[in-house]
Amino acid sequence: MGKSKFERNKPHVNIGTIGHVDHGKTSLTAAITKYFGEYKAYDQIDAAPEEKARGITISTAHVEYETPARHYAHVDCPGHADYVKNMITGAAQMDGAILVCSAADGPMPQTREHILLARQVGVPAIVVFLNKVDQVDDAELLELVELEVRELLSSYDFPGDDIPIIKGSALAALEDSDKKIGEDAIRELMAAVDAYIPTPERPINLPFLLPIEDVFSISGRGTVVTGRVERGIVKVGEEVEIVGIRPTTKTTVTGVEMFRKLLDQGQAGDNIGALIRGVTRDGVERGQILCKPGSVKPHKKFMAEAYILTKEEGGRHTPFFTNYRPQFYFRTTDVTGIVTLPEGTEMVMPGDNVTVSVELIVPIAMEEKLRFAIREGGRTVGAGIVASIVE
């Protein structure tokens, strides 16, 4: 079968498998490709290549498949640490997740941790695959495990009572040994994923935002800021705000340039130069953003979920304590911040993931789910995501 070209006519959704080690995440991924994509065997997926995201090495396997309704990009990680890093750095963006839980074991520590991470990094929806049901003879026991999973999801503010739970066996699907818990369950799972995981809003439909990378002054024309449009559209003549680092100011975009050509608008993904009215060369700087007025506010204090690199990953060699003051790299610039550890946590070791509170020395344009790198003198020592804004 020849390689079919990527069909753009279906909505595209990014998903991934999460759950405890050995509960069957990779087998399930293989089983889904068997019925909905180009079949990838367990070993092909398990030998996940390493990639770098925000200076951190992560092993992730990517597979693609499609249902009649959608095209999916699916990520599966070999090790628990890879999941933690992946979800925090957003190396593989997840619009939804399939939580794989063994019916024989029920929820285990990493089941809980992955649900917590999904909550912290803002995975919008979860569908559950209760795997290895052929290892449980007792229907009541199966019901008990399902109840446990629902309670666990609810305890992390997911709608545990409404989340679809599909019971089956990834192995039965791979081995064609029992159609009901094999192929049928996989098809039922994907129908649930189609129905329950919402299609993400395309970046172009969101309010305009441009992280400023550079500032120039062009004699006779004024000040130009450059960068890649993160989301939305900006049209010539529109009013925008400059947010972050200094007090918010309003200006008007009087021109948009791309590859030295004048355009009437710039949109998500474009690298543009935007000419802005009435702003001097030193009235704007790298690290600020241009955005639709009122859409983004500057903040200093936030709660973050962070992963701290190990020594082997090029990170710190020693733990850190409350009042640790690294730089936080948001979009295009470093800002110093003061870290406060949660009550009862005395120190954070390299390799830990942790929820901390941060206060920056200057405000930065930020929203929940914004990702950042933690740096010391230009060297990445961690990665994080804004879990919630305090002020």
From Swiss-Prot:
Residues 76-79 are annotated as: G3. SUPFAM superfamilies: EF-Tu/eEF-1alpha/eIF2-gamma C-terminal domain (SSF50465), P-loop containing nucleoside triphosphate hydrolases (SSF52540), Translation proteins (SSF50447). Residues 19-26 are annotated as: G1. The keyword RNA-binding does not apply. Keywords: Cytoplasm, Elongation factor, GTP-binding, Hydrolase, Magnesium, Metal-binding, Nucleotide-binding, Protein biosynthesis. GO terms for molecular function: GTP binding; GTPase activity; guanosine tetraphosphate binding; translation elongation factor activity. GO terms for cellular component: cytosol. It is found in: Cytoplasm. Residues 10-201 form the tr-type G domain. It is an enzyme of class 3 (hydrolase). Mg(2+) binds at residue 26. GTP hydrolase that promotes the GTP-dependent binding of aminoacyl-tRNA to the A-site of ribosomes during protein biosynthesis. Monomer. Belongs to the TRAFAC class translation factor GTPase superfamily. Classic translation factor GTPase family. EF-Tu/EF-1A subfamily. PANTHER family: ELONGATION FACTOR TU, MITOCHONDRIAL, ELONGATION FACTOR TU-RELATED. This is Elongation factor Tu. The lineage of its organism: Bacteria, Pseudomonadati, Pseudomonadota, Alphaproteobacteria, Hyphomicrobiales. The gene is tuf1.
